[in-house]
Amino acid sequence: MVMSAYPSIRERLFRLAPVASTESVPVLCIRFLLILMSLLVIGVMIAFGVKPVGMWMHRHRFILGASVIAACVLLNISGSSIGMWNYWLGHDMSTDVVWGTPRIMRTDEYVVGTPLAFSQSYSGYSYFNDLFGNKPADMFIVKDAPVLALAELFRPFHWGYILFGSSRGLAFYWSARLVVLFLAAYEFFLCISNDRRQEKHKGVAFVGAILIACAPLVQWWFAVNALPEMLIAIFVSIVCFDRYLGDTESGHRAAYAAVILICAGMFALTLYPAWQISLGYLLAGLILCIVIRHWGHIRISRKDALIFVGEIALFCVILGSAVVTSWGTIQSMHTAYPGARQSIGGGLPPLSLISSVGTLFFPFKDYAVDSVTTNMVEASRFVDLFPLGIILAVFGMIKRKKVDVLSAWLIAVIALFSVFACVGMPLWLSKIMMLTSVTSGRCVVVLGVANIAVLVRAA
């Protein structure tokens, strides 16, 4: 209603008339290149075969990923809905849009997050910014904006703003997170597949990575609450932990440990307990399963231990610097929200657990709200094909007459959070299980990731 009424209000109150749409030459060229590249990939696969091309892309996946990021930064391509400002100011909101349409619902991105990130260039990327409110605002903890601080090491996707400026920094922020999320999910699914030599499950891992990176839930929430960072931190840390235990060279282990600690800092600084706690259950089980996989072959030398202790100390110093600087902000966060939340779950319609495929169509048609969800963002899901993964996993364990620890843990996580989200539990039990900060609607993230993981594992 607001969107339909706004044009007349804009013209009468602000004297702003809509401007005719014009397609710029750069936008048309970018569209042509995207279509050309897609057709080129299809043509190469037809000419040389899907498997050889797929293996070539697998071998060069990191170079290809870096090339995509570089191209997006060079061409200033992002997924921001900042074009909505053209609409509010009486212009054509499709101006400079290569594909899709700006989403009015993503106000927390184009009204809050992106403008705050841009504002940092006017303060020299300072930790506190006095452009908002009656006192300097903590841009690192609350605003999740780029700052020049040691702890920014744990937020590598902000580096583009500092290195390239606001426009190309925004392009880096969007493209790097999507590419890295896809590659991290791909490596993770290769790691947890039943094929330890990772030769037969590349196609399955590719499909799993698509289901994660292109999930409706991930895309609707892409620019807020750091969901991609949480998933990247989990996937990369598990892959590095697996390689840490399987490698004996101290230099390699030092690098793996450093990446794991960066992921730990990234996960901690997302500061969204509703997702962090539920995903923490998943992470704990994955760590345990990796230890079981390498049990009996784990060797930690004194040199490895000393290096790891040194890296832990450096990690604590860097993270501690942010805690000390933002101590007042952190104390405030433990008052009304999220510190005072006392969730007991319940209220999620069980039917929503098996209706994830329908959320693929949300971008094409407005979603009719019901009593539980209020918009397309809240109703979005991972296309996890529940309960297919569980059925395949159970059938496989029965056929092999052997319990698969990882599949069993994933099924247990799915069962726990399905009951918590749909039925609920007493407050005392919710406190014991540290779920009071987790709402029913936010459980769909861990459910989606766990369902996709068990599906890939069982394939």
What are the language-model segments listed below?
Residues 17-25, 321-402, 406:
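Periplasmic/ER-lumenal interhelical loops and adjacent helix-loop junctions
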Residues 18-23, 168, 172, 217-229, ...:
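Membrane-helix boundary/interfacial segments in multi-pass membrane proteins
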Residues 27-80:
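Start-transfer (signal-anchor) and selected internal transmembrane alpha helices
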Residues 34-46, 233-242, 278-290, 314-319, ...:
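Hydrophobic cores of alpha-helical transmembrane segments in multi-pass inner/ER membrane proteins
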Residues 54-63, 251-255, 295-313, 402-406:
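Membrane-interfacial entry segments at the cytosolic side of transmembrane helices
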Residues 65-139, 304-364:
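Aromatic-rich transmembrane-lumenal/periplasmic boundary elements in polytopic membrane proteins
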Residues 82-232:
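Active-site lumenal/periplasmic loops and adjacent helix-entry segments of GT-C-fold
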Residues 182-191, 201-294, 304-329:
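Membrane-embedded helix bundles of polyisoprenyl
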